[in-house]
Design a protein with these regions (language model features):
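Non-heme Fe(II)/2-oxoglutarate
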Residues: 1-68
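Catalytic core of non-heme Fe(II) oxygenases with the double-stranded beta-helix
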Residues: 46-155
Length: 155
């Protein structure tokens, strides 16, 4: 697992890895200044085109999750900010499923769950899994160049 994790981390940190800038959540859900409602993303599945060249690598992450159907897999690169910015509470999909978040770097950012108030700290190679109907939010970090996570929605 550590070798796979390191290989993926090197892949996404490569200067030729393609990221697209997009909004994190809808404007009405965002909890801070809208200028911070941005992240860079790389959609692994379903691919934006016919094929994503990195899909096979990331498919190996799924082996431990007992997945019957993959709905979505997306990398998020959330740039560092001077103070922690909380993004809005949201669900990833209306469809009954699970969400797993794999953290790629250790930093002071976190995932927070609305119902319980629990915060899961961003720790490299940690994965958290929960019902997709559970409202959650992510944050920026202040002590690394970015917060890097893989978001997986599955059944």
């Amino acid at each position: 697992h550590k070798d796979l994790f390191k290989f993926i981390l090197n892949t996404i940190n490569d200067k030729n890895f393609c990221w697209q800038c997009n909004r994190i959540v809808s404007e009405e859900k965002f909890q801070s200044d809208l200028k911070y409602n941005k992240q860079f993303a790389h959609k692994i599945y379903p691919p934006l085109g016919l094929y994503n060249e990195h899909y096979e690598i990331f498919q190996l992450v799924l082996l431990d999750l007992n997945i019957e159907e993959l709905l979505r897999m997306k990398l998020n690169f959330i740039p560092r900010t001077e103070k922690i910015i909380r993004h809005g509470f949201h669900i990833d999909t209306e469809e009954y499923s699970k969400t797993s978040i794999l953290y790629f770097n250790t930093n002071d950012g976190y995932t927070e769950f609305e119902k319980t108030g629990e915060k899961v700290q961003s720790v490299a190679n940690r994965i958290v899994t929960f019902d997709s109907s559970e409202k959650h939010l992510g944050t920026t970090c202040t002590n690394d160049y970015a917060r890097l996570v893989l978001n997986i929605n599955w059944k």
